[in-house]
UniProtKB/Swiss-Prot annotation:
This is Probable conjugal transfer protein TrbG. Residues 1-24 form the signal peptide. GO terms for cellular component: periplasmic space. Belongs to the TrbG/VirB9 family. NCBIfam families: PRK13839.1 (NF010413), TrbG_Ti (TIGR02775). Its main location: periplasm. Disulfide bonds: none annotated. Keywords: Conjugation, Periplasm, Plasmid, Signal. InterPro entries: Conjugal_tfr_TrbG/VirB9/CagX, TrbG_Ti, VirB9/CagX/TrbG_C, VirB9/CagX/TrbG_C_sf. It holds the Pfam family CagX. It is found in: Periplasm.
Length: 270
């Protein structure tokens, strides 16, 4: 009788375990929608460019950066100068080691996160909270390949710099150029409420025209893509017109961060 009771109890326990596992794996409609949004943001290709000294540069907030490290090597993730780190949380804190380091003079020091995996074939996530923002980073370990230096470009910094540049520039009208000298052969792809109405160039500058409702503050940030890198060039807003002091072949307009971020691509020649 006692043995029969134990068997029955074990059977009930197994049933509860399987039921709990099944319940954990099933998802509600909102849970499915939420994980789909998160997966889409994590899976976005995003912009990756080259910075000083071979640094890999991610555009902050566009997607979840994936940093590849290797055993017996270190990955250096450099944060913004003056940024104060609050917490560093790693999903797999046993097989991944993260240590802080600093560079620069007092008052403008940059925090570096030195990342080292214990073995190849690992994937985990890391959340870094700072005085300015929160980083969501994926960590991968590879047998031999790794990113020695990683950094970020911040859209809000670009806006601040351009506002300073624009304050020192005249916001005169478009110089008189004969219509037959203008090149309208630009394609504009992507979806955003502020998507440009048209783009054209006079050979020296590029003009990006938005709807009348846009203002200088609402305008997206522009990056010129050249040599595989995202570069900041001088531009200014004149009412609904963005005037770029550069003959653009390819550029990207970015507004917002994270899953709310919107991006438009401009290409000369379609």
């Amino acid at each position: 009788m006692h043995r029969t009771g134990l068997i029955a109890a074990a059977g009930c326990l197994a049933t509860l375990v399987f039921a709990s596992a099944a319940e954990a794996q099933s998802m509600t409609t909102n849970e499915v929608k939420g994980t789909s949004i998160s997966r889409k943001w994590r899976g976005t290709a995003g912009l990756v460019t080259t910075g000083p000294d071979g640094k890999v540069i991610f555009l902050f907030g566009e997607t979840q950066p994936s940093v590849v490290c290797s055993p017996l090597q270190v990955c250096d993730i450099e944060l913004q100068g003056g940024e104060i780190v609050r917490d560093v949380l790693v999903g797999d804190s046993v097989r991944w080691k993260v240590e802080p380091a600093t560079s620069g003079a007092t008052g403008g020091q940059a925090i570096h996160l030195i990342v080292k995996p214990s073995e190849p074939g690992l994937v985990t996530s890391m959340v870094v909270t700072t005085s300015r923002r929160t980083y969501h980073i994926q960590l991968k370990s590879h047998p031999s390949q790794y990113m020695a230096r990683v950094g970020f470009e911040y859209p809000e910094d670009v806006s601040t710099k351009l506002a300073d540049i624009n304050s020192r520039l005249e916001t005169g009208g478009i110089p008189g150029t004969a219509p037959d000298k203008l090149n309208f052969s630009y394609s504009v792809s992507g979806s955003a409420p502020w998507k440009p109405k048209r783009v054209y160039s006079d050979g020296a500058k590029t003009y990006v025209q938005f709807s009348k409702s846009i203002s200088g503050q609402d305008a997206p940030v522009l990056f010129v893509v050249s040599g595989g890198q995202n570069r900041i060039v001088n531009y200014r807003m004149n009412n609904d017109m963005m005037i770029v002091d550069y003959a653009v072949d390819k550029a990207i307009l970015v507004s917002g961060v994270g899953w709310r971020q919107q991006k438009i691509t401009i290409r000369r020649g379609g």
